[in-house]
């Protein structure tokens, strides 16, 4: 936890423990063997992502010894080639190129008249032998790689096939999440008690094992060579007995029934029963709950089945009536597990919204107006569609499995090297002496940390535990202290270059290059933080507050001498704008964080690196669950077409007033984002609202920035303001009063999207003079707005 250092040392460092991971109320705290299991699982999960994203081939690693031998043999063949040239004398020295065939032909010609014909013949033989050995070892290395690819036919290498990678990404997060997060909070009144429910949960391992064994049988059948092929791809047929098509493929007889009764039904029984039992069972915080183990295994079985079946031509049937019924069962269990884990790690808001969309899917044919669809969707059709790249495996998971988890690993390395403490201490040294100093420190520190953190509420907990008590200490009302922290942490989500992962989701959805998005975000982010700074400064002036004394603050000179701790951030930004891929830039920055730590007392050795990967694995669970849950909503929108019909409403409104259409879009984006983490809020709003704005003729970048800003601002918009509520929990103020105050402090952000809609120069579009003029006039406008509000 973050602590206020009451015994200031000689350097007057204030921040101590900002980098420490906040503990959620329902997280299990293991000891001994349980801790080792979870830590190893989390570290392995994060490390495998880093390996996969950087294209390290699993089969190549296995074949590495043979590959080294082949390379040495190839080098020896090169040496034999040079020896033959030398043996040929002047003719060999005059030879150009590296063609073995031509050199051997030259040797044959030379031997007829040369005095050293025997020596030439021996050199030719040595060259042939060396080349044969190199070729044999190369074939052997290839055979090793191929053999392991066949043994792990469903997991051949890194980088994995895209769908397989995303399925395993979600499956691993489900397993880790259920083992780590309990169904209910471990509050003050919590008391573990023995229960027969543990025995019932243990019995649920039987249907889980039955389902897993069935999938293993499917996998063996597909890899046995008995499965039919069409166009070079193995096919998967799940047809009921008596089907005419089944008669042509007798090997698939019984698959349909097995998918229902031996895979689907046992899996759903175990899933739903374990969720119910988990809600009422009470297991000690340092022990695994059997119901959670069942849910973790269910998540892995779902992944195992989907990887198996999606590796065949059956993937082409996704979203149609021909989808295998087992996919519908797996998707039902998978979606249920995703929603349950989302409830555990992010609350009910997103789960309720997802539930509303699911209900809409199956009742849309009964509804009037723009919500209506012509034909009802069957259970098999919808769930056969939702666990695909049009839903759960779509843009949200694409981003969480690549950019987001990579930057979570980066953030974990920064935390392990205690860079977060330095950020906060640097902010105190730079701004602590200004009037209302701690509030201004909160703006800078929370903005920096929030940019990397990815969630407004999570950042409030991390930095607010330090800044909020200090703000109260210098005279801020507890309501205002919480509001400032909430507004500053929310601003981190719009601060380039990382933007709390929002920039990466926007790039994935729109296809706009990441660099262009990050550059466009600069002026709006400056306007937001200038506004918050002015609001804080005016409040401090109105209340006659002082800054902190110099003897209460870290020494600025010492902080400047440690400026090298910003090197990982600088490398990240520099690499991105040099045109490096996001993956490569993030990896370089992560490595830099470990290297820079050796210039500090917190040197990262092997143990610290493993700890960083463990921390990253744990930190990633919430965002992965949230993105997958948002993917369910995206799947509903893509199947029903409700987004297109919403666009038609916006077009009708725009015919009367474009400003009215924008205001309506703003309200929908905020409503959809209420109670949801930033990434999910934007992903859902982008699916519903952004297409309509684009159809109004608004440029795609402007439309998505408009939606993104209001999705972010839902975190400080009453009545459901996650960041404000988290801050109120620390400050001790009324949550609703805090959310109203944070809304007031961040009021400029509600105007900025309309500003860049009417003047695209604020998004760095236009000449340098236009951009400078737009930025300057916007800052003046923000100044007068802040003055008027205060």
Model-derived features: where do they sit?
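Hydrophobic mid-bilayer segments of alpha-helices in multi-pass membrane transport proteins
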Residues: 36-43, 166-178, 198-208, 259-275, ...
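Low-complexity, proline/glycine-enriched hydrophobic segments characteristic of transmembrane helices
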Residues: 54-162, 209, 221-254, 765
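Transmembrane alpha-helix interface/packing and boundary motifs in multi-pass membrane proteins
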Residues: 411-415, 446-455, 487-493, 576, ...
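Membrane-interfacial loop-to-helix junctions in multi-pass transporters
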Residues: 323-329, 390-403, 430-442, 474-480, ...
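Long, contiguous bundles of hydrophobic transmembrane helices that form the permeation core
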Residues: 2-42, 61-65, 192-196, 201, ...
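Core transmembrane alpha-helical segments of multi-pass membrane transporters/permeases
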Residues: 97, 136, 340, 344-345, ...
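Transmembrane alpha-helix boundary signature
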Residues: 184-188, 217-227, 277-285, 304-320, ...
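Hydrophobic transmembrane alpha-helices that form the pore/transport pathway of multi-pass ion
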Residues: 424-492, 498-505, 511, 678-710, ...
């Amino acid at each position: 936890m973050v602590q206020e250092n009451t015994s200031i040392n000689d350097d007057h460092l204030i921040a101590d423990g900002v980098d420490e991971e906040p503990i959620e109320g329902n997280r299990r705290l293991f000891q001994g063997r349980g801790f080792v299991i979870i830590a190893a699982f989390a570290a392995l999960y994060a490390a495998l992502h880093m390996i996969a994203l950087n294209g390290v081939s699993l089969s190549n690693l296995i074949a590495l010894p043979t590959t080294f031998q082949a390379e040495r043999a190839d080098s020896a063949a090169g040496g034999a080639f040079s020896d033959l040239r030398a043996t040929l004398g002047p003719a060999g020295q005059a030879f150009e190129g590296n063609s073995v065939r031509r050199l051997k032909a030259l040797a044959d010609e030379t031997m007829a008249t040369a005095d050293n014909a025997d020596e030439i013949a021996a050199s030719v033989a040595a060259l042939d032998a060396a080349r044969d050995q190199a070729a044999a070892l190369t074939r052997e290395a290839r055979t090793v790689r191929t053999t392991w690819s066949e043994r792990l036919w469903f997991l051949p290498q890194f980088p994995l096939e895209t769908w397989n990678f995303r399925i395993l990404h979600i499956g691993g997060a489900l397993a880790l999440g259920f083992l780590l997060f309990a169904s209910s909070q471990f509050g003050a009144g919590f008391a573990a008690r023995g229960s027969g429910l543990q025995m019932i949960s243990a019995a649920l391992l039987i249907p889980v094992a039955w389902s897993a064994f069935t999938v293993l049988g499917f996998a063996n059948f597909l890899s046995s060579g008995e499965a039919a092929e069409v166009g070079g791809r193995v096919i998967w047929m799940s047809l009921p007995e008596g089907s005419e098509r089944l008669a042509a493929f007798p090997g698939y007889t019984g698959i349909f029934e097995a998918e229902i009764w031996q895979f689907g039904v046992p899996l759903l029984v175990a899933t739903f029963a374990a969720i119910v039992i988990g809600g009422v069972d009470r297991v000690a915080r340092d022990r695994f709950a059997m119901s959670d183990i069942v849910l973790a295994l269910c998540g892995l079985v779902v992944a195992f089945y989907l990887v198996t079946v999606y590796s065949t031509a059956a993937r082409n049937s996704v979203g149609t009536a021909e989808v295998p019924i087992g996919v519908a069962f797996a998707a039902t269990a998978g979606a249920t597990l995703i929603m349950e884990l989302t409830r555990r790690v992010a609350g009910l808001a997103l789960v309720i919204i997802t539930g509303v969309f699911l209900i809409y899917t199956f009742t849309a044919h009964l509804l009037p107006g723009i919500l209506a669809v012509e034909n009802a969707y069957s259970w098999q059709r919808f769930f056969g569609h939702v666990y695909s790249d049009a839903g759960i495996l779509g843009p949200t998971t694409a981003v969480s499995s690549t950019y987001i988890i990579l930057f979570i690993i980066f953030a974990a390395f920064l935390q392990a090297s205690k860079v977060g403490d330095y950020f906060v201490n640097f902010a105190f040294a730079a701004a602590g002496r200004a009037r209302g100093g701690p509030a201004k420190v909160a703006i800078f520190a929370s903005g920096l940390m929030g940019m990397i953190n990815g969630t407004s509420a999570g950042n409030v907990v991390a930095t607010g535990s330090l800044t909020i008590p200090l703000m109260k200490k210098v005279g801020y009302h507890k309501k205002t202290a919480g509001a400032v922290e909430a507004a500053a942490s929310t601003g981190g989500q719009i601060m380039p270059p990382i933007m709390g992962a929002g920039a990466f989701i926007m790039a994935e959805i729109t296809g706009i290059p990441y660099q262009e998005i990050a550059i466009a975000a600069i002026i709006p982010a400056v306007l937001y933080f200038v506004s918050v700074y002015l609001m804080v400064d005016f409040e401090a002036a109105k209340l006659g507050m002082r800054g902190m004394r110099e003897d209460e603050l870290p020494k600025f000179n010492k902080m400047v001498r440690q400026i090298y701790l910003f090197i990982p951030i600088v490398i990240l930004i520099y690499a991105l704008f040099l045109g490096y891929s996001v993956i490569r830039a993030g990896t370089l920055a992560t490595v830099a964080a470990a290297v820079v730590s050796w210039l500090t007392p917190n040197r990262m050795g092997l143990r610290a690196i493993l700890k960083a990967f463990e921390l990253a694995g744990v930190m990633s669970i919430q965002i992965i669950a949230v993105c997958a849950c948002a993917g369910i909503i995206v799947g509903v929108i893509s199947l029903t077409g409700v987004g297109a019909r919403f666009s038609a409403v916006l077009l009708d409104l725009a015919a009367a007033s474009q400003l009215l259409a924008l205001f309506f879009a703003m309200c929908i984006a905020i409503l959809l984002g209420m109670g949801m983490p930033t990434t999910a809020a934007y992903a859902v709003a982008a699916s519903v609202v952004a297409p309509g704005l684009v159809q109004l003729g608004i440029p795609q970048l402007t439309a998505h920035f408009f939606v993104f800003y209001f999705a972010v601002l839902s975190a400080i918009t009453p009545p459901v303001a996650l960041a404000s509520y988290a801050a109120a929990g620390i400050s001790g103020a009324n949550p609703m009063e805090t959310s109203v105050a944070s809304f007031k402090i961040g009021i400029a952000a509600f105007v900025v999207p309309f500003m860049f809609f009417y003047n695209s120069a604020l998004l760095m579009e236009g000449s340098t003079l236009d951009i400078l003029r737009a930025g300057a006039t916007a800052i003046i406008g923000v100044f007068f707005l802040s003055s008027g509000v205060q």
